[in-house]
Curated annotation (Swiss-Prot):
This is Digeranylgeranylglycerophospholipid reductase 1. Binds 1 FAD per subunit. Belongs to the geranylgeranyl reductase family. DGGGPL reductase subfamily. InterPro entries: DGGGPL_reductase, FAD/NAD-bd_sf, Geranylgeranyl_Rdtase_fam, Geranylgeranyl_reductase, GGR_cat. Its EC number is 1.3.-.-.
Length: 403
């Protein structure tokens, strides 16, 4: 039997961050992943904002950056578009090469002192007097791992968390996603990501083209709600109709679920922490979860290491993880579901009006009050929705403007 202080299940970005920070904090750590190659297959559109890496104290590395991004274009259902650049809004980002990025994050965990076990499937986890016993199937046969603290980072609707009595099921708002990595994509600018809105494009969701340079891009979409069409059927229709993809050819396909419901009911318990997609640490509006999950992993690892030093693994001690994550994520994962519901209630006509009005704004010379003036030019029902949305997303700014 292998004995350790902390075991992390899943070597995605969140799990690797948890393992890294637990090891940096002095704990003995084992990081387990069921795949024979960390990072494959990729699970997302690979887009991140650069500010997130500053929060994580990670220096961007050209080896895992496919493309730097300096702007975004939103396409409305009627064919109009609105573009914002980093000159207008001080936000930049990257399109990652996840197969490289995930490996580097795992290597950082190893350099911090974590032991990595690949092609090892955790088949069962049970409590004992010391914490947990994990049963694992590996290439060397069946092995057992005993740990004082377990960190579940095993993806949406965590199987291991369920085995421990945690309700990790996403009851609703599981975004169904389909994506192709494609070549010969005719995008206008490889430094801008593109979003396509409309119920025919993606019901209660959106489609995206994330360029990776040299005509290569991730082309995908996510849908929510009740629909007779699958995400795969939606993406095939989109690729056929979108001018940018009419000559594109697929080189990889990814299909899966994205939990945009917000945090699960419980992300910690006695001897247990849950992070990443397993915890619902995903932006409820746009479905991004790389940075959000890594912040969760960093918080989980830090708290686990301190708990090991104190020899206190109770849920009362591990509650610090919840507080730390809420602080690091600005509590957005808990507040944004209400904003998501507003965004996904927009009709095609409302999207058309929003994009049309947005094009009247001079982003380089506009105040917060000017934004409200533009919003009030819209139909009353849409204005009400947007005011509610702005109050949720920018509560402090809206309070200072309105009161």
């Amino acid at each position: 039997m292998l004995k350790t202080d902390v075991v992390v299940i899943g070597a995605g970005p969140a799990g690797s961050m948890a393992a890294k920070h637990a090891a940096l904090g002095g704990a003995n750590v084992v990081l387990i992943d069921k795949k024979s190659e960390i990072g494959t297959p990729k699970r997302c559109a690979e887009g991140v904002y650069d500010e997130g890496f500053k929060w994580l104290n990670i220096e961007p590395d050209e080896r895992w950056i496919a493309q730097r991004i300096y702007g975004a274009t939103l396409h409305s259902p009627d064919g109009n578009s609105f573009t914002v650049t980093s000159e207008d809004v001080p936000v930049q980002g990257f399109i990652l090469e996840r197969k490289v990025f995930d490996k580097h994050m795992a290597m950082d965990a190893a350099r911090a002192g974590a032991k990595i076990m690949i092609k090892t499937l955790v088949t069962d986890i049970k409590r004992n007097e010391n914490g947990f016993i994990l049963s694992c199937d590996s290439i060397e046969g069946t092995i057992e791992v005993e740990a004082k603290i377990a960190i579940c980072a095993d993806g949406p609707e965590s199987i291991m968390a369920k085995k421990l009595g945690i309700n990790s099921t996403t009851p609703q708002n599981m975004m169904s996603c389909a994506q192709f990595e494609m070549c010969n994509v005719d995008y206008n600018d490889d430094e801008k990501i593109e979003f396509y809105l409309g119920q025919d494009v993606a019901l209660k969701g959106y489609a995206w083209i994330f360029p990776k340079g040299n005509g290569v891009a991730n082309v995908g979409l996510g849908v929510t709600g009740n629909t007779d069409k699958t995400a795969y059927e939606y993406i095939m229709d989109f690729i056929e109709k979108c001018p940018a993809t009419k000559n594109a050819q697929p080189i990889e396909m990814n299909i899966g679920g994205d939990p945009i419901n917000g945090l699960i009911e419980k992300i910690y318990d006695d001897n247990l922490l849950i992070c990443g997609d397993a915890a619902g640490q995903v932006n409820p509006i746009e479905g991004g979860g790389i940075i959000e999950g890594m912040l969760g992993g960093m918080a989980a690892g830090d708290v686990a290491a301190k708990a090991i030093k104190e020899e206190n693994y109770s849920k009362e001690r591990l509650h610090e993880y919840y507080e730390k994550y809420s602080e690091l994520s600005f509590n957005l994962i808990e507040t944004l579901p209400a904003a998501r519901d507003i965004v996904y209630s927009f009709t095609d006509d409302e999207y058309n009006k929003i994009i049309s009005v947005a094009n009247t704004i001079d982003l380089k010379n506009i105040s917060k009050r000017d934004v409200l003036k533009v919003v009030f030019k819209l139909p009353p029902t849409l204005t009400t929705k947007l005011i509610k949305l702005l109050k949720i997303v920018f509560p402090k700014q809206m309070k200072s403007i309105l009161f």
